[in-house]
Regions:
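C-terminal functional modules
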Residues: 1-30
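Sequence-level preference for short, compositionally simple segments enriched
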Residues: 1-4, 290, 300
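Conserved beta-strand/loop scaffold segments within soluble protein domains that form the structured core
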Residues: 27-289, 293-296, 307-311
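Beta-strand segments within the central parallel beta-sheet cores of soluble alpha/beta enzyme folds
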Residues: 302-306
Length: 311
């Protein structure tokens, strides 16, 4: 069975259908290790990809004013137990353009493997980028994933990101994102992670509200069980009049798991405001009792509550 087919068959684990790779109206990239297995572009979109021994290097550019009708699927992964992957990508969204990127990171058999991603994203004036990233690391806990991204949100532009790793084991995950927002720009960063066994999760998301009336939200939901560990840091700085930001972190701890939440808020202008809230604890006892009173077993009730938190 080919590596391309192996990754295709894993797509449903992150909510995608393999058939999207066959649709001529949908742009995509499939990369295995440092090899590009398949790619397709559409009008208004430019994909420049290069295979190198040490990385896949690429640029994704959306023309000014273009509205890409269907999400762009970017599928990267490894279909073997061991290996390494480095992705270096530059994303540029032209002024007044609108695009949705679905990133699928697939490592179904990983026992000792590594994935690194270094990205820069620039969203032009009045443009919009929605970036949805789904991961599946298999059941073995042998994956190390280290994504790093810097994002620039232009004047009046929008950036929405949603990261999820909810099925299988996490392994070791270290996220480091920095977002700069110009005047009237908006950014919302959402992350949802379910840790098991000996998983280690480190999330650091930082936003700098540089322009007047820039707005942001960092929202994180994590459920940790067994002997897993999580350290989640959300940082928001406000530097201009009318800037508004909020950091919202909720972690649920079960078994012998450990979790920490570190909200950091800084304000450098008297007319700016940043708020935060963080909560760490066990499953809500009242919710649990209510569900059990309706006939659910304790395990079913906990599973339902957890699924609601990670929805």
């Amino acid at each position: 069975m080919s590596e391309l087919n192996d990754l295709r068959l894993t797509l449903p684990m992150v909510g995608a259908e393999p058939a999207i790779l066959d649709d001529p109206s949908i742009a995509h990239v499939v990369g295995h290790g440092h090899h590009i297995l398949s790619h397709r572009t559409v009008p208004g979109l430019h994909l420049d990809l290069e295979e190198r021994p040490e990385a896949i290097v690429g640029k994704l550019a959306v023309e000014a004013g273009a509205h890409i009708a269907h999400p762009i699927h970017m599928c990267f992964g490894l279909a073997h137990e061991t290996g390494a992957q480095q992705i270096n990508i530059n994303v540029e969204v032209g002024e007044q353009a609108h695009v949705h990127v679905l990133a699928h990171c697939l490592f179904p058999l990983a026992k000792s493997a590594q994935h690194r991603m270094s990205a820069t994203m620039t969203i032009g004036q009045g443009a919009s980028l929605t970036y949805t990233e789904g991961h599946y690391h298999g059941p073995f806990g042998g994956m190390q994933v280290l994504p790093h991204a810097t994002i620039r949100v232009g004047r009046g532009a929008r950036y929405f990101s949603d990261f999820s790793l909810l099925s299988g084991s996490v392994g070791n995950l270290e996220i480091d994102y920095l977002v700069d927002i110009e005047e009237d720009g908006i950014a919302e960063l959402t992350a949802k992670v379910f840790g098991h066994n000996n998983d280690r999760i480190y999330l650091k998301e930082a936003i700098r509200l540089l322009g007047k009336r820039a707005r942001s939200l960092i929202k994180t939901r994590a459920v940790m069980e067994d002997a897993s560990r999580a350290e989640i840091t959300g940082i928001t700085e406000a530097h201009a009049a009318g800037a508004r930001g909020h950091v919202d972190c909720m972690e649920v701890v079960q078994g012998q798991a450990h979790a920490s939440a570190i909200p950091i808020v800084r304000v450098f202008h008297p007319e700016a405001k940043v708020t935060h809230e963080a909560a760490i604890g066990s499953v809500d006892k009242h919710e649990l009792e209510t569900l059990m009173a309706r006939g659910l077993a304790p395990e079913q009730a906990v599973e339902l509550i957890v699924s609601g938190i990670l929805r």
